[in-house]
Amino acid sequence: MAIRKIPTTADIYLEVDGVRVAVVQSYKVTASRESKAIYAFGQSEPVSTIRGQSQYVLELTRLYATDEAIRDGLNFCEMDDFSLVVCKPDRNVIYTGCQWKSLQESAEVGGNVLEKVTVEAGRRIENLL
């Protein structure tokens, strides 16, 4: 029996208007979706369910702003409607419409790093390579 390998991530970064502004060391995604039960008249049990909205919560660890973004005065606290791009060997996964929920910052003198950022994304797109 052949062992099938799971593709690992080759690159993770944040984009604003198509420009890479930060690299990310690791990420964790929690996807959830609401659903609604549909009841027929006189039935005590649902006859169907309707799929609701999906929600993506991403936990990003160790973010480093790019040199260009630093020169342009990037401020993570003011970032709005950005994308997270996860490059895998066979596809790119892009989370768009991102808004940050929480920021935990820790840095050494002369360093530019955000330790942990929690983000909510509006949409998930997969592009096969």
Question: Across the structure, where does each feature detected by a protein language model lie?
Answer:
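Short, acidic/charged, Gly/Pro-enriched secondary-structure junctions
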Residues: 71-96
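Hydrophobic lipid-interacting interfaces of membrane-associated proteins
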Residues: 120-127
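Short, conserved charged micro-motifs
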Residues: 67-74, 128
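Solvent-exposed edge beta-strands and adjacent loop segments
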Residues: 1-64, 89-116
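Short, surface-exposed, charged/polar-biased interaction segments
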Residues: 45-48, 81, 121
